[in-house]
Amino acid sequence: MKYSKLFLTIISGVLIFSCTKPRTTAGEFIFVATGNVQGSLKPYKIRLDSLGGLPRRATFLKDLRSSGTDPILLDAGNLFNEQDNSIGLIKCYNEIGYDALNIGAQDLANTINISNLEKAAEFPFISANIVHMRTGEPVFKPFTTIERNGIILAIIGLTNNLLDNSSVEYGIKDPIQAGKELLEILANQSDYQVILFNGSFDDAVVIREALVEADFMIISGHTGVPRKTQPPEKGPFLYKVGEFGRALVTIKTRIANTDSSLKDISMLIEREKFIKETLHLLRGGSSMNLEKMYAGNYDMSQRIKRIKTELEFAQIELASATNTVEFDFIPLSSSIIDDVDIKRIINEASIAVKK
């Protein structure tokens, strides 16, 4: 009997140890995110150019990897549309090396057999709250974990609601309830938690205020152009991704101490850049000290003093940030050369559809 108790004690200890995340003190990782692609394989025409296209996206990511960066590639949902090019998208995403796809409302409504697409994918389809209507069981993996430089990230998929033309086979669980349940479990298994959310921006704000334990939230369903904004007072950083794959969102995170909070410095960097450009314009190409240049102009001297004080404050705040997050939005213009392998996959997929 005593040996049985000892065995159970050992097994319990192993389970507890295996479910607890290892401690990491420093490192960095970068998300590259898309969403609302809506079946777009090729560039989207605009007035004077074209934007997007999977061949350009692949080229950008190859260049990024060649620089020594190993990005985490995420799609927040609404990848597929009604056109029969879904398998071509999956093949391209496999070749590019995506890490996870959140299944959005349009993805379920616009695909005949999503389980076949999931089998063809070399990356997980995730959703914590899309369930089988009959059993209430999840249709997809609720989350996936990814490690970069010793830092463990949990990626959770959530969708706010399904479309009316979705299969009666599927139902939806309250995203807040599903998110809270997962975040509680994943807190001890990961260093940071990321929510891929499919829904409107207003829906995302409500979800963010309820799921304050998460660190990042990437939203599909909102089609506005992504912009750098002030971070929220509480809850995860919320990032939009645009639509049709016309651009890529990058979120670069540098961790000096996992026990310290994250700080989005995107707006601070923009502020510092703007102030430096202003001072450069005031100098007018001269190498003379600004104070000497405007010594006889009291109002201008006071303005320069205020500007330099603002610059000093911005630089102090940047220097004092322990764990930093930097958002960027990169349009995929025609200046980016098409990747030949992705072009071949798209052409082959187009031929197959026409047969």
What is each model feature region?
Residues 19-355:
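Acidic, metal/ion-coordinating pockets
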Residues 9-11, 36:
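Alpha-helical protein-protein interaction elements
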